[in-house]
Amino acid sequence: MRCPFCGHDDTQVKDSRSTEDGVAIRRRRVCSACTQRFTTVERVQLRELSVTKADGRRVPFDRDKLARSIRVALRKRPVPEERQERLVNGLVRQLEASGEHEISSHRIGQLAMDALREVDGVAYVRFTSVYRDFREVEAFSKILADMKPIPGETDTPSPDDSQETP
């Protein structure tokens, strides 16, 4: 593997470990020329996917772009990084298992919205507002009205919570 610091082709693997979810291998490497250390991550790619954009262009599927979008939506939310990574891995597995080589950007966006809706309502609204390009406050109102409350995620106290105990 080529060193990202000096470009030398000769690097050595010093340590290899499976990730927590078991879908990737992290390798710690050292360059024999400049002695810099760096980490690589290897993932199994079941098939080459391409994305069909709304304007008809086809581009290679970019897992990192999907991961960045998910992380932006979940920024400052109480969702651990490991959970975020599992969410992205699950989305990628769904896409790969679909049997399709070309997937529309609309389908990817819809899958991401559905997954975020299950994980965190605020992240869902954030992602959806960017993905659907909300330009008016009414769009936010409509999506909030359409959301069904998820059990255990209510901010309003139940009637029993408001009563004081004697």
UniProtKB/Swiss-Prot annotation:
Q: Pfam families attached here?
A: ATP-cone, Zn_ribbon_NrdR
Q: Where's the ATP-cone domain?
A: 49-139
What terms describe the molecular function in GO for this protein?
A: ATP binding; DNA binding; zinc ion binding
Entry coiled-coil feature ranges: none
> Annotated region Disordered: where?
146-166
The stretches annotated as zinc fingers (unnamed) lie at 3-34
User: Which cofactors?
Assistant: Zn(2+)
Record bears the keyword Zinc: yes
Copy out the cofactor comment: Binds 1 zinc ion.
Q: Name one GO biological process term.
A: negative regulation of DNA-templated transcription
* Keywords associated with the record: ATP-binding, DNA-binding, Metal-binding, Nucleotide-binding, Repressor, Transcription, Transcription regulation, Zinc, Zinc-finger
Its biological function?
A: Negatively regulates transcription of bacterial ribonucleotide reductase nrd genes and operons by binding to NrdR-boxes.
The entry sums up its family as follows: Belongs to the NrdR family.
| Cited HAMAP family | NrdR (MF_00440)
Q: What protein am I looking at?
A: Transcriptional repressor NrdR
* Originating organism: Gluconobacter oxydans (strain 621H)
Give me the gene this protein comes from.
Answer: nrdR
